[in-house]
Each structure stands twice: as structure tokens, then as C-alpha cells.
A protein has these predicted regions:
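N-terminal leader/linker segments that precede catalytic domains of diphosphate-processing enzymes
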Residues: 1-53, 58-114, 145, 150-180
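NUDIX/MutT-family hydrolases
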Residues: 118-154, 158-160
Length: 180
């Protein structure tokens, strides 16, 4: 864990006046048992360009809660409908310094992956990772990634040619700890 994370608490994060976001960690029964839905963001001029992420995004006042934000964004980005999903609960919040975001992840489940409708401006494609792979950590190893601070060596999940790092990897790490 980066040393600056040791000193982060909710009060310290709040003093940075972060943008708030909610993400949906969707689990479904797939070919290899429980799988986690992820998406690839398109390449654009921004901090999270081309990264693997969970469906989710920035809080809007009409959302009222970050859980509602997660559901709204998941519908807008990949077509997941709240009424087709069983809410499981929330994971730990996290702070993303490069983009100054405070993020709350919410876990949902469905017996099968609902039909997805991708918003092309926000999603290049989706992929899923079997929970067994995440839990046995066989796909975790360091990766060199480019950040706004320059190149950095970080722990990452490697799956189907993709490098899953940053906040997404941290959330997957917590999910792994809960299911192991």
C-alpha cells in the first residue's frame, strides 16, 4: 500500500473537497461460477483514459445517495437495470488522489448477466473475471503503468490481456478478502 494511504481518514479526505462517485460491483453466475463485471473505458484526454473499471461515475444532486449514483451510472453506461439486480451491500470507501474522487462501491448480484447495452462514449467493451481467479490471486502481479505523476510500478490483476490496477484493483482486492 502506498505510504500516503496510511494517513487517509474520512476527515482528511473531506478536507480535499473531493468529487463523489458510486460504482457498481456486479456479480453474476457465469461459465466459471461467480464472475465480476468490468468495463474498459475508451481512450480520451483524462485521468482514467483506457482503464478497466466498474460501471459507475460522478454523483449528481438528484441521485441523493452514492448508491443511487452507482445504479444510475450502471444503467447509463452498460444498461444494468436496478430492478434486475439483487443488492448485496457496500464495500469500503476509497479515495483516488490523481482524480480527487471519493468512491463508494456497491455490490449487486443476478443469476445471469442481463443483456447489456453499452454507451459507446463511455465504454469500449465489457469483460468479466471469475471470482475464483480473483480469490486465488494467481492473476495478481506487478505492472508498470503510466500515471499523471509518471510511470509507476503497482500491484495489478492481469486478465485476458488487460491490466486492472488502481481503485478497481483495490476494490477487487477487498472482494477477494471477503470471499476467501
Amino acid at each position: 500500500m502506498p505510504s500516503y494511504r496510511n494517513s487517509l481518514n474520512l476527515e482528511a479526505v473531506a478536507s480535499k473537497n473531493p468529487k463523489r462517485a458510486g460504482v457498481l460491483v456486479h456479480l453474476f453466475d457465469g461459465v466459471d461460477g461467480l464472475e465480476v463485471l468490468l468495463m474498459k473505458r475508451p481512450v480520451y484526454d483524462g485521468t482514467h483514459s483506457g482503464q478497466i473499471s466498474f460501471p459507475g461515475g460522478k454523483f449528481e444532486e438528484h441521485d441523493q445517495t452514492l448508491e443511487n449514483t452507482a445504479y444510475r451510472e450502471a444503467f447509463e453506461e452498460v444498461g444494468l437495470r436496478k430492478e434486475e439486480l439483487l443488492p448485496i451491500g457496500a464495500l469500503s470507501w476509497l479515495y483516488i488522489p490523481p482524480s480527487n474522487f471519493y468512491v463508494e462501491p456497491y455490490v449487486t448480484y443476478s443469476p445471469a448477466l442481463p443483456e447489456l447495452v453499452l454507451e459507446e462514449k463511455e465504454v469500449s467493451y465489457t469483460l468479466s473475471v471469475p471470482l475464483t481467479k480473483i480469490c486465488d490471486r494467481s492473476i495478481v502481479r506487478d505492472a508498470e503503468v503510466m500515471t499523471k505523476y509518471g510511470p509507476s510500478r503497482v500491484p495489478a490483476f492481469h486478465w485476458q490481456g488487460e491490466v486492472i490496477w488502481g481503485a478497481t484493483a483495490m476494490i477487487l482486492g477487498e472482494l477477494s478478502a471477503l470471499f476467501s
